[in-house]
Design a protein with these regions (language model features):
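Long, contiguous interaction/recruitment modules in multidomain scaffold/adaptor proteins
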Residues: 1-35, 216-218
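Alpha-helical segment of the N-proximal tetratricopeptide repeat
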Residues: 35-67
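Residue-level recognition of tetratricopeptide repeat
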Residues: 45-46, 80, 120, 154, ...
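Position-specific recognition of the canonical hydrophobic site in helix A of tetratricopeptide repeat
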Residues: 48-49, 83, 116, 123, ...
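Structural marker of alpha-solenoid helical repeat scaffolds
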Residues: 67, 101-107, 141, 175, ...
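TPR alpha-solenoid repeat register
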Residues: 74, 107-109, 114, 148, ...
């Protein structure tokens, strides 16, 4: 209980009974043995999530793309695998293919993820103008609005366009108030803009949400040059 008598934590023991043993995990079929593209995608996704030691999710996605080269989800999945492997140019092509299918009949897609991922791959190659456009297009979809605006704000910051960066990071925070990366970026933007008091106030607000926001704590050290802050982070 807290000081006001509110229940904070409660524990109830399970009844002493023997529960049925869960079914053992089934081995994945070989890609050629799987009939549908849907199941190929889901199998690849499952293998990624569980980081299987002997099965390669890429094989399942590539089998799906042999049957349907324009499949949106499998192109996006292959692109992401290539991103994690540092193959940014290869990833870009798969995201383009996913987007081509996604926008065949509707220029404003129902899912902004391939556009966001395309922006990420382009940014990692230093193609900032193209990345900027891709990130912006991702914001058409509400689910990717905060991530898209955050990507735009990052490129604004790379260009040292602090006014635009502040505008876009605020848009990211409107859609995800607890985006801790965006909070650190906003603190950095305010510092670069000479708004140190605003930056410190925003940092304190952010640390009330999450005391482990190390990006904001480092910004606080950077502004005040207070070694105590740095020591607390590294202790």
């Amino acid at each position: 209980y807290d000081n006001n008598g509110k229940l904070l934590l409660e524990y109830k023991a399970d009844k002493p009974e023997i529960k049925p043993t869960p079914d053992p995990a089934k081995a994945a079929k070989q890609p050629k043995e799987i009939a549908s593209i849907e199941q190929l995608f889901l199998t690849g996704l499952h293998l990624e999530q569980y980081r299987h030691a002997t099965y390669d999710p890429m094989a399942y996605y590539m089998e799906a793309l042999e049957r349907e080269p324009g499949d949106i989800r499998c192109n996006n999945a292959v692109g992401l695998l290539n991103m994690r492997r540092g193959k940014f140019e290869e990833a870009e092509q798969y995201f383009h293919t996913a987007i081509k299918t996604l926008t065949e009949r509707n220029p404003n897609p129902y899912d902004g993820e391939p556009y966001y991922n395309l922006g990420w791959s382009l940014k990692m190659q230093g193609k900032y103008d193209e990345a900027y456009s891709a990130y912006y297009k991702a914001t058409w979809n509400a689910a990717w609005r905060d991530a898209g605006y955050f990507g735009v704000a990052q490129i604004d910051s790379i260009r040292k366009d602090w006014n635009a960066a502040l505008e876009h990071v605020d848009l990211a925070l409107i859609h995800n108030w607890h985006n801790h990366k965006a909070r650190q970026l906003k603190a950095s933007i305010l510092r670069h803009s000479g708004e140190t008091e605003k930056a410190l106030k925003f940092i304190e607000e952010s640390l009330t949400i999450d005391k482990f926001n190390l990006g904001c704590r480092f910004e606080k050290y950077f502004i005040g040059n207070n070694l105590t802050e740095l020591q607390e982070m590294t202790s």
